[in-house]
Amino acid sequence: MKIEHSTFNVQRPMSNDTTLKGQQKIAKGVSPGSLKKSLVTGGAGFIGSHIVEALLKRGDRVTVLDNLSTGRKENLDLLEGRDEIDFHQVDIADYESIKDHFRGVDQVFHIAALADIVPSIRMPFAYHHSNVDGTISVLEAARAAGVKRLVYAASSSCYGIPDNYPTPETAPARPQYPYALTKYVGEQYVLHWGDIYDLPVVALRFFNVYGPRSRTSGTYGAVFGIFLAQKLAGKPYTVVGDGSQTRDFTFVTDVVAACLSAADSDIRQESMNVASGNPVSVNRLVELLGGEVVHIPKRPGEPDCTYADTTKINKLLGWEPKITIEEGVNILLENIDYWRNAPVWNPESIAEATEDWFRYLS
């Protein structure tokens, strides 16, 4: 299948329907019948593919830009038979390759980025190219095309280890590693373009997003993908430290609703937290998944807690999370086969993969 600079042709539906489970609760931000033209960078990735799906559901024409370095074409297979989606395999940092795709676009959802901690320590140039240069390229393309709104996927990692919980948007930025730094620098560019060039922008700081289609690549990363692959393999969960650390896990459809609400609002030049506002311990996650555990050393540079103050987004957009952790875990278990071919981590392979983490962040 030729995909570069061509209409994306969906080939088959996914074996598990991840579109309906849990998405009945994303009413805010999804208004069927809107006739917008939207563009999603990173639209074949985890969060991006869910945004694409929601945009099509409400009646948009959608352009997807993704270089497939971490995204998967299979994440868009469920859109079988839809001719309202155009897919282009391009590097967002290549301005000349992407600029024409922004013509006539109303809303841009800039989700594309290189993620994960360890690879960013090992490959800082690559992360700057994707997350900073790529963001500037997207901003310039949006500005040149006269795009009406741009929503940027910022990261809660900008807070580092905060002084206060719940953590408000006014907390100081203390990025602990190159990924966090590049996402924060990208956010500052977005807000700067909004101020200088009058481009209507909103930055949403995502907290610990999870849900169907979360990444299954070989990089050691988010806890849900690791645990689900271990559960499928009948292996113990590798719990960092004593498991008492808490995370503000936020279900992906709640994140999608926040993105669409921000895009459809008149709010501009603002950064807002997007989170459940209900931190859950890793031990509680293990309890919900069921299974044995093995403990591995606690890592430097990781907060004991992530816990967002969501007062601002609730006040400005009326957004509130809908999916509880219990509901979210049940949805993941119903779709667990998605992680069938994901790598199965053990204490030894994790120690090897995180060697640079301890070396540079200790």
Give, region by region, the residue ranges found by the protein language model.
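Mid/C-terminal beta-alpha module of Rossmann-like enzyme folds, strongest
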Residues: 265-300, 309-310
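Arg/Gly-rich low-complexity intrinsically disordered repeat tracts
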Residues: 2-21
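Glycine-rich Rossmann NAD(P)(H)-binding loop
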Residues: 41, 209-213, 239-250, 272-280, ...
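N-terminal Rossmann-like NAD(P)+-binding domain of SDR-like oxidoreductases, especially those catalyzing
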Residues: 16-209, 253, 331, 335, ...
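Residue-level signal for the nucleotide or nucleotide-sugar donor/cofactor binding architecture
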Residues: 71, 93, 122, 130-133, ...
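Conserved C-terminal active-site "lid" loop/helix of NAD(P)H-dependent oxidoreductases
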Residues: 252, 283-284, 299-321, 327-331, ...
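Glycine/proline-rich active-site loop of Rossmann-fold NAD(P)-dependent oxidoreductases
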Residues: 184, 209-225, 233-235, 240, ...
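Hydrophobic "lid"/C-terminal helical patch
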Residues: 51, 259-263, 286-289, 329-336
